Regions:
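Beta-strand elements of repeat-based all-beta scaffolds
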Residues: 1-378, 382-495, 499-516, 520-537, ...
Length: 733
């Protein structure tokens, strides 16, 4: 048998493969590094050296090791961080227990783990979590298809199949009554096995019952079994055409009556998209938007030409990884390059944003041998440190304010987890417990407790929809209750004061009416595409909306019949707004959608006011001119706003710390105001050279608890369990 030793792309990029004498692949090498594999006598991979470690240490590098039993089952995975994953199997080779690294005990070579049970055919029938709780059970038919599944909270789903094995019905239990009630979804197929209808029951029914009404979605296909129409019974419709290779050449969508979104696609001989042409309706003189694409010999997208002529260029390395993206808007002076560098494992090490005037904003990331990000450094040099447990869960996050380079550690936000990976506790860098959580067997939070003991309890419907939210304490009270219809669409909310709000919904679950406790009712109507076409307030006043084929508002008619008009450019940016009195605002934007020109005038086009914006090559505003006044903006080497000027005179200047927060503001007279922050990044002090000073204190939930002024005045705040200010007290020193 022949094995490839080298693969060379049309661009000359090479990947080399090494084998042993029996044809086992031992190495994979490219321009970025090498992955080394080792095998045992039974041809099982026993080690995988991480590419970064291999580049430093060769065959002595670190990586992941695998151990097997005599049946060839992998029983241990030894990770480079010292973690061990243990696996156990039955006589048929089915994994019956999986112990995660954090639960593994080396002395017993075991630990608490997930357990799996199987039937005589080797099909999984039960899953238990490390605590012994049943998370899922499964039942099958003779063809191995799931007939019934139940989760740990009792949610039951039943499946029915036709004689060809196609699923034709789902029944989801929504009420544990006697008899139980189910939500039904039905599927219909054509003779080729294509799904031609999805039907959602509008009423809850007993098991195997038939709802009185259905919400139906219809599908049709061409002779090649390509999906060509999707529609509902209320006017929504999508249509597709294809070429002989199966590429979509036309996509048409109904937006509103008489307005369709029509997009044409063109491809090259390789089947790669080269042009996207969107017909635009209901948008004045702009009637089409054309986007063009170009590729290299490997099929990587190398150039995008936007409808307004801007260009996006992309370059790749030998492994088809993006190395540079250049955004070019010549008309508006934008020429931004973003360059990427990778390690041998393909992780992004550096990102550099480059401008034509020498600007370079570089950020970097470091990774461990499990490819987890451990350090992120921003352009100013601020480091955010991440530490993980052996199950790859984030256990500590250290901000630039807490990071200590000497120890490569520091005070940070800490997290603890349960055996299923749910976050149990959050502790801030000051050691204060911010929040504690507990979960049901569906991993939904059921209890939330903050640092002050405020306890919020959440309960859920059988199918997982939230049922009510309660606040426990001296007097337990309901904060909110929710009601749903058979489709599990929300139909009512009762607030903490027992005021009910009712919702009318259409078949898609869109709110068509809201009824308030005082008898006031609001109404909503929609286009076939699902956008609001009309709103009716409690007094019967209506506001109407019309849309263009881009799906953006083109007209708004208010309660008095006055109309606002909106027009957009080829890229969807607002280009014209005419208000109810005829006043006009014309706008032009750059490639990033930022305004570069605005002209405001009255209904006759007179009394104009022109505003312009200028940007540097990175797309940062450097000058704004409005009503005869000019404002200039200057940035520091790290991308932060350094100075704002008006007609050449300094208005204000800023200094920032490594975390990007302001540490000093200097006014035109040179008066300096300084800012300090605590280890959590909260503003803790404001002061100046004249002796003025303000200090801020916070509680564990980041709410201001006191403000102390230099003259001795102190303001203290207390809060209720919902975070509302309960008391505010100011005292003189």
């Amino acid at each position: 048998r022949a094995y490839p030793s080298r693969v060379i792309t049309p661009k000359g990029e090479e990947t080399a493969y090494g084998y042993d004498t029996v044809g086992r692949r031992l190495s994979i090498s490219n321009t970025y590094g090498t992955v080394e594999l080792a095998y045992n006598s039974r041809n099982f991979v026993t080690s995988r050296i991480h590419p970064v470690s291999y580049a430093l240490k060769g065959e002595e590098g670190e990586g992941t090791r695998y151990e097997y039993n005599s049946d060839g089952n992998c029983i241990r995975i030894l990770y480079p961080d010292g973690g061990v994953e243990r696996r156990f199997y039955d006589a048929d080779g089915n994994m019956i227990k999986q112990v995660q690294p954090e639960s593994y005990d080396a002395d017993s070579d075991d630990g608490n783990g997930y357990r799996y049970a199987y039937d005589a055919c080797g099909r999984m029938t039960e899953v238990q979590d490390p605590g012994g709780n049943i998370l899922h059970t499964y039942e099958y038919n003779g063809h191995g298809q799931i007939l019934r599944e139940v989760d740990g909270e009792g949610k039951e789903v039943l499946y029915t199949y036709n004689d060809l094995g196609w699923k034709i019905r789902e029944q989801i239990k929504v009420q544990e009554t006697d008899p139980a009630l189910y939500r039904v979804i039905a599927y219909t197929y054509d003779s080729q096995g294509n799904k031609v209808e999805e039907a959602y029951g509008q009423q809850e029914v007993e098991r195997d019952g038939e709802p009185d009404g259905w919400h139906r979605i219809h599908f049709s296909y061409d002779k090649n079994n390509h999906l060509n129409v999707v529609k509902d019974d209320f006017g929504a419709k999508m249509r597709y055409d294809y070429d002989c290779l199966g590429n979509v050449t036309l996509e048409e969508r109904v937006i509103a009556d008489g307005v369709h979104s029509v997009i044409h696609y063109a491809y090259n001989k390789n089947g790669w998209l080269v042009q996207r042409t969107e017909e635009i309706q209901g948008n004045g003189p702009v009637q089409a938007a054309v986007t063009r694409y170009a590729y290299d010999a490997n099929g990587n997208l190398t150039k995008i030409t936007t409808p307004k002529g801007s260009e996006i260029h992309r370059s790749y390395d030998a492994d088809d990884r993006l190395t540079e993206e250049r955004v070019l808007d010549r008309k508006n002076g934008i020429d931004r390059r973003v360059q990427y560098a990778y390690d041998a494992a393909g992780n992004v090490l550096k990102q550099a944003i480059l401008g034509t005037d020498g600007e370079c904003l570089e950020s970097s990331t470091r990774y461990d041998l499990k490819d987890r990000a451990t350090h992120r450094t921003n352009p100013a040099g601020g480091v955010t440190r991440y530490l993980y447990d052996r199950n790859d869960r984030l256990r500590k996050e250290i901000s630039p304010y807490g990071y200590e380079p000497e120890s490569d550690d520091g005070a940070g936000v800490s997290y603890t987890y349960d055996s299923r990976g749910n976050r149990l506790r959050t502790t801030n860098a000051l050691g204060e417990v911010v929040q504690e959580l507990s979960y049901n067997l569906r991993n939904q939070p059921v209890i939330q407790k903050d640092t002050f003991g405020n306890r919020t309890e959440l309960s859920y419907e059988l199918d997982g929809k939230i049922k009510d939210v309660r606040r426990s304490g001296n007097h337990q009270r309901i904060l909110q209750q929710y009601e749903y219809n058979a489709r599990r669409q929300i139909t009512g909310v009762v607030d903490g004061n027992r005021n009910p709000i009712s919702y009318d919904v259409d078949s898609w679950g869109r709110i068509t009416g809201i009824g308030f406790a005082d008898g006031v009712k609001e109404g909503y109507e929609y286009t076939p595409a699902g956008q609001i076409s009309r709103t009716i307030d409690g007094n019967g006043n209506a506001v109407q909306y019309r849309y263009n084929s881009l799906g953006k508002v083109s007209e708004r008619t208010d309660q008095l019949g006055f109309t606002e008009t909106f027009r957009y450019d080829e890229e969807g940016n607002l280009s014209l707004h005419i208000d109810r009195d005829g006043r006009q605002l014309q706008r032009a934007c750059n490639v990033f959608g930022q305004p570069v020109y605005e002209k405001a005038s009255d209904a006759e086009g007179k009394h104009t006011n022109i505003s312009t914006w200028h940007y540097d090559s990175l797309g940062r505003v450097t000058r704004a001119v409005c009503d005869g006044k000019s404002y200039e903006y200057i940035y520091d080497a790290y991308g932060n706003l350094k100075e704002k000027r008006s007609n050449g005179k300094r208005l204000v200047s800023y200094t920032h710390d490594r975390a990007g927060q302001i540490t000093e503001i200097r006014d035109p007279a040179g008066v300096s105001t300084r800012y300090e922050y605590d280890i959590l990044g909260r503003r803790s002090r404001i002061f100046n050279d004249d002796g003025l000073e303000v200090r801020y204190g916070y509680n564990a939930l980041n709410r201001i608890c006191d403000i102390r002024y230099g003259n001795g005045v102190k303001t203290a705040y207390t809060y209720d369990g919902d975070g509302n200010v309960r008391t505010l007290e100011t005292r003189a020193g």
